[in-house]
Amino acid sequence: MALIIRAVAASDKADWERLYAGYAAFYKVEQTEAMRAVVWGWLSDPAHATEGLVAERDGALIGLAHFRAFARPLSASTGGYLDDLFVDPEARGAGAAAALLAAVQAAGAARGWTVIRWITAEDNTRARAVYDRLADQTKWVTYDIRL
């Protein structure tokens, strides 16, 4: 029944795909098997900046986090960017999201990063309740230029 947070491993591929497809479905983002294969390739390549963590309980994966370093020129420092955080809906409320965030925070602290940053949907109230306990909401507004 113990929760284990660890780096994603090659043997996690099927469970990771299930979780990542669930994450895409939650945000109503079309995601193909080929797209998941690209991300899995990144996570499997030690030379790629994107890293993956998983939350495991009773031998089953219940959550994932993807993160990477990013340059912060204005402060001449490096931060960590949390690209994805997802916990299986059946496993929510038991601390997996907080544990994944704590593991990303620990990785960043060990590397000398100055911040862990991420975005979430404004209406993602359940996740925001966790984030509001563990982090500070910023004043920044996000923009995209689609290419």
What are these regions (language model features)?
Residues 117-127, 146-147:
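Conserved beta-strand-loop-alpha-helix junction that forms the acyl-donor binding cleft
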Residues 91, 95-103:
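Conserved acetyl-CoA pyrophosphate-binding loop and the N-cap/start of the following alpha-helix
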Residues 4-18:
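A short beta-loop-alpha structural element at the N-terminal edge
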Residues 54, 60-68:
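Conserved beta-strand in the GNAT
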Residues 31-52:
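Active-site rim helix/loop that mediates acceptor-substrate recognition in acyltransferases
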Residues 98, 122-141:
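Conserved active-site alpha-helix within GNAT-family acetyltransferase domains
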Residues 18-31, 73:
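Helix-loop element at the rim of GNAT/NAT acetyltransferase active sites that forms part
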Residues 109-119:
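Conserved GNAT acetyl-CoA-binding A-motif
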